[in-house]
Amino acid sequence: MRKSFDDLTIADDFMFCKVMQNEGICKEFLEMVLSNKIGKIAYLSPQNSVAAGIEAKSIRLDVFVKNEDGKSYDIEMQVSNEYNLPKRMRYYQAAIDIAFLDKGEHYKALNDSYIIFVCLFDAIGKGKPLYTFENICIEDGQTPLRDGTKKVIINAQAFRKAENKELKGFLEYVKTGTVNTEYTGR
């Protein structure tokens, strides 16, 4: 059964993509989640498919933007837990890298990238509102690989535990529909 427009929430794919097409909202979201200023952004792919090859599984990106430094950000809304998010993020990263590195180009040409999933559930199961991952040396637990990739899983279910007021308000809005910050009121 299809929902009417008035019944859509930010968690609905259509509405999430429409809201994130507002450059100010999308930029502020990224800065809030990553705790960094990211500069001007440009949209690369509003809900476009990316295929790694003719017979490869394609992916459909909800929101795909790049900042003025060349970093790319894939933002996805995930409503149901299919228990495959880490591997799905891995595949998305690989498909994006393949799609944006042309034959003959050096690997150095790969831009830094972030894969961000906003989830209505706790995909990792540790009760945190935000999980940020990058490749780290197992032997010393601190040396980064510096491959330019980060993966972020946002758990709207844990909105009460978010320390940043704006992030807490956004997560509560995603989970419950309650508007209580300037950001979510836009």
Residue ranges of each PLM-predicted region?
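Elongated, amphipathic alpha-helical interaction scaffolds
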Residues: M1-R186
